[in-house]
């Protein structure tokens, strides 16, 4: 059986789970960071113009946004009728974000980015460019802005219709839905209890390593003032990473990339950083966004760029494409593989930063332990019914006592179920795959071949990656 057939078989099996229970109105498309309203403006701003037809198609697309938002409102109305509407806390967050988006309409970045892209088209006259500028601004004010305002007004009107401000397990059939969601998000076949056990085991291992380093290096700390690239630009860091990774990875495919800042009107609702997946017909068009609101700089920016760039998302996307992965697979979404890979290699990047080995190891284990706390919280809030009080008790055991910060963590996990799991559980699955490869190939094992093999397989549930790992590994020899 080919890998495409195997993926199709698993996908149909997974769909059967959803068919057995009607989970139609359980998903929330208005999630604060990863939901439709937050993601759409970025996709529109990155809609690439190769010729005038692309410009005209884009303007036509804007005219369809009101009907798209009408469908969103219909869906949310049905969620209200099913007793599955979002909580007041989530509604307040979304309303604030939508207000920010709408209040920046005088010189909105969807207007300015359009102008910049049109200005770069060489076959347009100045008059034609000016005409398109006018059309776009009119379309923004006629279609885009009213759609976002209608969504905001809907949330204001229906705030209070939600019945659950805690985990998914408090909804009818919520525990079963969460289990299905976890599989969808992670690609891991392990049960909820097994995932909790895996997470705790890795956390204990990381904390043991931290204690060992601290004992053998008195006075060592988590500060990174000695990071040699603390004043480097993001582009300089990415160039450094593309060279440094070659001891563990094949050299990156020749490609272009750019680093951009999230616009001010979207900073509150966007992630600290993200890689925008390159188009399948222009795999060299790679864009990484940094959110200024996160205030990432120095070492933290370096590891973030490793996650988003080399050897993270950018490297994975371009390498998998160059390996001949069927383009049709790009329509399938396996976030556990994609984010798990980026988190796994982010941990490796600590050794590329030019810090003393013991300092790099301390920082890496500390970050891994921190991510494990979020994973345990996600699983426990949505599957075990943890309240805010339970989360406070859990995190206080690890020295996290800031009540406001803990409350924000709780609210975010409630609003974005399984979000942290695709990163952390995905990372653990890659670590388990590495252990399996070492055991299977013995003296012939190398990290470089392992990395190339899993990237050649491409995004898939982890059982499938493991099934095909032996064959793809041999092809790298």
Name these PLM-found stretches.
Residues 1-477:
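N-terminal maturation segment of proteins
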